[in-house]
Amino acid sequence: TTDADNAALVPATIVGQLRNGLGQCLTSQDPKGSDGTPVWNSNCAGNSAAQTVIYEGDGHIRIGDRCVDVLGGYTKEGTVAHMWTCYPALESQMWDLNENGQLKNRASGLCLTIPGDTTRGATQAVISQCSDTSKSQRWTLTEASGQ
């Protein structure tokens, strides 16, 4: 399937949490933070603003008023993900959720990953080669109740 086909797997906009295969949620260090705020894993907490994501049909993942972005738009494996001002056409901020549950960055073709498949909280997310065996790359978008 193509990335465009995969994008069709997700409705236009979903509000909820992104939980990986290790039971950890994608979390912004500070949902009201500035550009460069780290994005990492942590235990999932019900209505945490730091874990409330808005997955938009164009591929943007918002937490608060910022988007999950790849540092500097780099496409090198191991580059960290962080929060940045949202730009409509910036591919380093666009993620396709594929049929394997991986969030594939459009600019790099790499997947959003918690290094080492760890459940140790506050491990900053990076982009890395997509792997069918990495539980930290298996994301489930859980819609918030009432949405």
Question: What is each model feature region?
Answer:
Residues 2-34, 49-76, 92-119, 137-147:
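Extracellular glycan-recognition/adhesion modules and their associated mucin-like linkers
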Residues 32, 76, 86-87, 131:
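Alpha-helical protein-protein interaction elements
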Residues 37-44, 79-86, 124-129:
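Aromatic-rich beta-strand patches that line glycan-recognition/binding surfaces
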Residues 45-48, 87-90, 131-134:
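Short coil/turn segments at the loop-to-beta-strand junctions that recur within blades
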